[in-house]
Structure formats: structure tokens, C-alpha cells
């Protein structure tokens, strides 16, 4: 049987039609040298600054130094499996991370990969990690309170939604405790008002894994993990991960800001990010400057913190609040990184070792701490009671230093010292016990209106506990009225509050 020519051509045509061209074009380079988490690569002529590249075995890296004859790449992972001569592929993508509600309740690394063993993350979109901050036109001045639940902070150093407030102090002074209490305090507000929810992001930079695990456990126990994402670049992670984590977390939080929602981000702490960046820069042979930090270390933090903002109505009224943490050495706030971050932020909370060891916790130095947003981030009732307490504590500090020299003090000075000692005692607060706005107003009002003057200093804590228990049970109406009405505390409102506290004071013994 002879094969027909037409048949052959039909078969060939069919084969050609179904031929799939599987050839892929990729721009590749070769590793010249590798070590200390840095790879020098030759041949990636068109690579962009900040572009993600891929090494054999799926290890990722980011191109940071674009030089004439080679590219300096930082490696997001172990450099042990990379050797000289390995091929490096361009991905044609800038470093991006997943974003959306699917991240809430999860623990992720600096690239947004889950590390909590709860399966893959369902993300609505991907966002570039390092983007430009919003301009001047979309912004609005800060005017809504972001309550921390801490008496000393909410009354004297108020934080608003969209503000950047630095928490600064030596190691072991309670910086993370303030940040953690702020996250825990949002639970009651989020439950009461789901439409105005505050989504929290906690970035752990260069911390021990055990510390991060403890923190996550605490958040889960308190039911706060449902609105929180933890981004962890721990001490055992490479420096590029510690450098990238804050930017990645900010990109995740910006999803909420840009969609008319509210987010809070805590960077714990930025001193370690600066150290990681210094390490990378020196290994990339960039010229060192003051304290061996590179010349652009100010820009490192300014471009990060400028992304926290309050947007106006035309842009959805969303907000992103930042609480960066900086660790000082021996109380030296005039070092390079602390002064940089102080100048970028809208205020700072100073924590002092001395106060901490005196038992004043949170160890906030109310004289040096400041909020540059001020009372515009406070409710009416809080504004009314915060003014007098600030003044009285300032006078007390001045007089206390003075009173050490003389013993014969006049009655007015003695009264001022007594009141100041009680107010200082009143500002103490145990960890994990945030108070609502109304409760803080009632407690501080009691302190500034003489209800504590006859109470011994040691009994102030017991008085406060008793007063809060009384208001929560017998006089719920007062707390509800303060929350709903938010009155200015004067005239009838002042009388109503005074009467309620006086009722309790009679029973206190």
C-alpha cells in the first residue's frame, strides 16, 4: 500500500500546528563572589535597582548596587548554597508582598511568607514593599484619638490616628509593653465599633524568636490576634530581611489606609533595622559616615515613617498610625539614630530606667515626652481633665527638686507636693490592664479635684481600683454618659462626675 503525498502533508501540517514552543528567554548573570549575605554578579546589565532576582534552589535576592561591571545583590536567605559561577535570573519584578484582610491573625516573615504553620495566605492583592509616601494634597491634619489605654499617655501625650509617635528609652524600660498594651486596648473599641476598626501590625526586628512567640501567645490569649498581623525578622534572620521587614509591613498596612480603613503599625525596633542596613552597606562597600552608618540612613527612616498619614475625605479618610521604637544606650538620646528619628516623628514618649526602678511604670518622663499633635487628638472630656493634671505635675516636679533643700515649707507648697505625689502614684498602671477613655477621665478627675488629698499615698492604687469597680457596677450610667456624650467637664457635667466620685469616697476606708 503506497502512502499518499496528500496524507503525508496533512500529518505534517497537523504536527506543526500542535507544536508548542517551550523555549523561555531569561536574562541571566553569573555569581563572581559570594559571602556575608552579599553576592557580586556579572551579566545582569538591565537589572533595576530594588529588583528581585532568583538564585538556584529558589533563593531570592535584591539588587542594591548597580556598578559598571557587576551588580551587588543582598540575599534573602542562606548564602551557603550559592557558589561562584552559579546562574542568577532576573524576575523583572520589584520586591512585593501580599496585602489584604487575609493577613490578619497571621505571623509572616519579611517577604510575607507565613511562618505560623497555618497554611498559605489568601491575599487580595500584592503591593510593592518600598513605595512613595502620600503627597501633601491627600493628607489631612490628625484629629481623631488613637487611645492606648494608658493614663499617662492618653492624658498627657495624646496620640491621634495618622500620627507618628516615637517610643524611646534604654533596654528593659517597658517600650514593647506600651506598644503591646496599645494593641490590646483596641479590642474593646473594635468590638464596640466594627466599622471604625483599627487593624494592628507589629514588626519584630532583630528580636529573639522566643520573645516573638511569647508576644503572639499573649495576643492570642487576649483575643487581639484577630485584628493583628505580626511581621517577624528575628535575630537569626539575615540582615537584608531585618532591613526589609518594616517596609513590607508598611505596604501591608497601607492596604487598609488606602481603602478608607484604619491601621496601626509598631516598629520594634528601628535601631536594629539601622544596624542591619549599616551591615549591608559596609559589605556592599558603600562609604561610611557618622558612627559608620551610611550617608542615607536618615532617608532610610524618613521614607518609611512618612508613609504613615491621615488621608482626607476625597481619598477615603483612611489612616495609618506609626509607633516606632528606638533603643538608647545609657539614656543618650543625642546619638545619631535617636536624633534622626526624633526629628522625623510627631512627638516622643521618653522612658527612663530610673523611673522604672522607682516603681513608676509605665516609666514615662512626662517632662521630656511630648506629642506635637496635642489636644486635637483628644476627646472633649479628656481635654478638660488633662490640662490641670499636666500643670500640677509640672509644678510638682519643679517644687520637689526645690523642696529637697528646705524643710520649712508654707502650706500652699506642702499642698502642691502632697497632690503631686498622689497624682504620680495615680499615673502608675500594671501591664495588660488598659482602661477606656471614660475610666481614665473619671480617675484623673478624682485626682485633680482633691478626692485623693486625704488618701495616704500607699492607698491611692486601692482607691483607684475601688472607684473603677464602683463605676463599672453601681454607676455604669456615668461611664456610658462619658463615652456617648463626651461632654466638656464643666458646670452640670462636672457636678455629675463629682457627685458620683463623692458617693464612692464616703464608702472608701
UniProtKB/Swiss-Prot annotation:
Known catalytic reactions: ATP + H2O + 4 H(+)(in) = ADP + phosphate + 5 H(+)(out)
GO cellular component, one term: plasma membrane-derived chromatophore membrane
Principal localisation: membrane
Gene Ontology MF term list: ADP binding; ATP binding; proton-transporting ATP synthase activity, rotational mechanism
InterPro entries cross-referenced by the UniProt entry: ATP_synth_asu-like_sf (IPR023366), ATP_synth_asu_C (IPR000793), ATP_synth_asu_C_sf (IPR038376), ATP_synth_F1_a_nt-bd_dom (IPR033732), ATP_synth_F1_asu (IPR005294), ATPase_a/bsu_AS (IPR020003), ATPase_F1/V1/A1_a/bsu_N (IPR004100), ATPase_F1/V1/A1_a/bsu_N_sf (IPR036121)
Assigned EC number: 7.1.2.2
Localisation: Cellular chromatophore membrane
Binding site for ATP: 169-176
Record flagged with keyword DNA repair: no
Membrane topology annotation: Peripheral membrane protein
Enzyme class name: translocase
Classification via PROSITE patterns: ATPASE_ALPHA_BETA
Site (Required for activity): 369
Any Pfam family the entry gives: ATP-synt_ab
Keywords attached to this entry: ATP synthesis, ATP-binding, CF(1), Hydrogen ion transport, Ion transport, Membrane, Nucleotide-binding, Translocase, Transport
Family: Belongs to the ATPase alpha/beta chains family.
Purpose: Produces ATP from ADP in the presence of a proton gradient across the membrane. The alpha chain is a regulatory subunit.
Subunit details: F-type ATPases have 2 components, CF(1) - the catalytic core - and CF(0) - the membrane proton channel. CF(1) has five subunits: alpha(3), beta(3), gamma(1), delta(1), epsilon(1). CF(0) has four main subunits: a(1), b(1), b'(1) and c(9-12).
Name of this protein: ATP synthase subunit alpha
Gene: atpA
